[in-house]
Amino acid sequence: MLQLNYSGFTLETGTDEAGRGCLAGPVTAAAVILPSVFENNILNDSKQLSEKARALLKPIIEEQALCFSVTHLFPDEIDEINILNASMKGMQECILKLKHIPEYIIVDGNRSLNAKLGLKNTFGKQFSKEEIELLKSIPNQSIIKGDAKFLSIAAASILAKTYRDEYMDQIHEEFPMYNWKQNKGYPTKEHREAIKKYGTTKYHRMSFRLLPDQLELDFFE
């Protein structure tokens, strides 16, 4: 069973991202502060849940959380600062958007939330000096497979996944030949074959290479 709290602080935030391994679409981050009393027997890592279960949990999390935030970082920014930095920046942005300032932050993964904090970029949000100092002032802990251990990270993973899926469903209508409604931008065989046939779109990440055995496609050519 997932644990509710890691640090002992009341305003503990869990944060996670979705879409890191995709060829198209944003990387989406979320942050959630759950109340000190919260129980849900279904809530788990979003990757372990069905689409139906995630859809069921999304409004429950939104209604019962003390606060939450979600943000998208789009391909132009991903291409500029790389996907790892974009993932961390998305989670940093989510912390800043929360209604309450967290007392402690737990992060899914093995990287400190403050890694590459304040990275300069042309696209997307630029952090102010005050925002950087605020993020530095909040203690944080990275937890490997945290979305399968702590409820707030699991809740963040579900919001990140569901909000991103909704976005991919929307842009599918513009470019249905890539079938983003089904593959959500991940490098399925069907998606790779569509890229080979139709080329890339404004929603594709141009910094991502497909290996030679993945239809010999190279975005840099």
UniProtKB/Swiss-Prot annotation:
Task: Report the residue ranges that make up the RNase H type-2 domain in this protein.
Answer: 10-220
Where do the annotations place a divalent metal cation binding? 16-17, 108
Q: Name one GO molecular function term.
A: RNA binding
PROSITE patterns to which the protein is assigned, alphabetical:
RNASE_H_2 (PS51975)
What EC number(s) is this enzyme filed under? 3.1.26.4
InterPro entries assigned: RNase_HII (IPR022898), RNase_HII/HIII (IPR001352), RNase_HII/HIII_dom (IPR024567), RNaseH-like_sf (IPR012337), RNaseH_sf (IPR036397)
As its record notes, the protein acts as a catalyst of:
Endonucleolytic cleavage to 5'-phosphomonoester
Q: How is the cofactor bound?
A: Manganese or magnesium. Binds 1 divalent metal ion per monomer in the absence of substrate. May bind a second metal ion after substrate binding.
What top-tier enzyme class does this entry carry?
hydrolase
Q: Name one GO biological process term.
A: mismatch repair
The protein's required cofactor(s) are namely: Mn(2+); Mg(2+)
Main localization category: cytoplasm
Family, similarity comment: Belongs to the RNase HII family.
Instruction: Identify this protein by name.
Output: Ribonuclease HII
